Design a protein with these regions (language model features):
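Structural microenvironment flanking redox-active thiols in thiol-disulfide oxidoreductases
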Residues: 83-143
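Thiol-/selenol-based redox modules, centered on thioredoxin-like
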Residues: 157-199
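N-terminal targeting signals for export/organelle localization
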Residues: 1-47
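Buried hydrophobic packing residues in well-ordered domains
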Residues: 55, 74-77, 88, 119, ...
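Short active-site neighborhood of thiol/selenol oxidoreductases, capturing the structured segment around
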Residues: 62-82
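Short, small/polar residue-rich loop motifs at catalytic or cofactor-binding pockets
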Residues: 43-45, 67, 163-165
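A short beta-strand-turn-helix
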Residues: 49-68
Length: 199
C-alpha cells in the first residue's frame, strides 16, 4: 500500500504538537490554524453514527466513561493494518483484565468494501475485544474529521487502495485526547501510554 504514515513519538499531550504538524498539511494548506485546532476533538464532541461488526449502532458518546484506543484502516490493507491489529492484540493480552476497561475500535476507511460481515470475518483473526466499525462514507468522513485523521482513495491497476493515518489514538475516560502510538512503536513505549489512560 502506498502510504504516507504518520510518524509520531508522543508520550502524552505535551508531545501532541508533533501530531498536529503531521496533519496540518492536508487540513489547512491555505490558512493558518492553531495547534489546538489540529488535535483530535474530545470524544464527547465528535458526531458520527457507525455500525459495529456485530451489527450494533455506535456513537462516540457511547465511549465516554471508559478509555478509548482507536485505529483507522481497511481489511484489504496488505501490511500496516494487520500488523497494527496484531500489535494491538498483543497489547491487550499484556494488559490482562485491565484491557477489558478499554473501548478498542478499528474504524474502516473503506466502507465500500468493508461491510459489517467483512469486518466480522476479518476481526476473527485478532483479539475479540477489538470492535470493528463501518457505515456510510459520509459517517466515516465525520469520524475521521473528529479524530483529525486523514484518508485518501488511491487508484491502482484498475482497482484502488487506501492511504490513511497509521497511528493508534488514545483517549482518557473523560474523552480527552491523550496520545498517539506510532506505527511499529516499541511495546516498551506503547504499553505505558495505554496504562496511563487506564490509570
Amino acid at each position: 500500500m502506498r502510504r504516507r504514515q504518520l510518524i509520531l513519538g508522543v508520550g502524552d499531550v505535551s508531545g501532541a504538537l508533533a501530531f498536529t504538524l503531521g496533519l496540518g498539511w492536508w487540513q489547512s494548506r491555505n490558512r493558518v490554524q492553531s495547534p489546538a485546532a489540529l488535535l483530535p476533538l474530545p470524544i464527547g464532541e465528535m458526531n458520527f453514527a457507525l455500525t459495529s461488526h456485530l451489527g450494533e449502532p455506535v456513537r462516540p458518546a457511547d465511549w465516554v466513561g471508559r478509555p478509548t484506543m482507536a485505529f483507522f484502516g481497511f481489511t484489504w490493507c496488505p501490511d500496516v493494518c494487520p500488523t497494527t491489529l496484531s500489535e494491538i492484540s498483543g497489547w491487550l493480552e499484556d494488559l490482562g483484565p485491565d484491557a477489558d476497561r478499554l473501548n478498542t475500535v478499528f474504524i474502516t476507511v473503506d466502507p465500500e468494501r468493508d461491510t459489517q460481515q467483512v469486518l466480522a470475518d476479518y476481526l476473527a483473526n485478532f483479539d475479540p475485544r477489538i470492535t470493528g466499525l463501518t457505515g456510510s462514507l459520509a459517517e466515516v468522513e465525520r469520524a475521521v474529521a473528529g479524530f483529525r485523521a486523514r484518508f485518501e482513495k488511491v487508484p491502482r491497476d484498475g482497482d484502488y487502495t487506501m492511504d490513511h493515518t497509521a497511528g493508534v489514538f488514545l483517549f482518557r475516560a473523560d474523552g480527552r485526547f491523550a496520545s498517539i502510538i506510532d506505527y511499529h512503536e516499541d511495546r516498551s513505549f506503547a504499553l505505558p501510554k495505554i496504562r496511563r489512560v487506564l490509570s
